[in-house]
């Protein structure tokens, strides 16, 4: 699970530089079941 969370965090950080809100919305929708990880990343 750690690797999963890390990959999500990395892609979010990289994409955030381009479209923060849009990327965040997509990430939340794609990984909604992993809410705890999203809280840590956010």
UniProtKB/Swiss-Prot annotation:
Job of this protein: M-factor is a mating pheromone produced by M-type mating cells. All three mfm genes contribute to the production of M-factor.
Gene Ontology CC, one term: extracellular region
Any one biological process term the GO annotation gives: positive regulation of pheromone response MAPK cascade
GO molecular function, one term: mating pheromone activity
Subcellular location: Secreted
Lipid positions (S-farnesyl cysteine): 39
Chain intervals for the UniProt region annotation (Disordered): 1-23
Modified residues (Cysteine methyl ester): 39
Name under which the protein is recorded: M-factor
Keywords from the UniProt entry: Lipoprotein, Methylation, Pheromone, Prenylation, Secreted, Stress response
Induction per the UniProt record: By nitrogen starvation. It is further induced by a pheromone signal. Its transcription is limited to M cells.
Disulfide bridge positions per record: none
Principal cellular location given in the protein's record: secreted
Residue stretch(es) of the prosequence: 1-30, 40-42
Domain of life: Eukaryota
Organism: Schizosaccharomyces pombe (strain 972 / ATCC 24843) (Fission yeast)
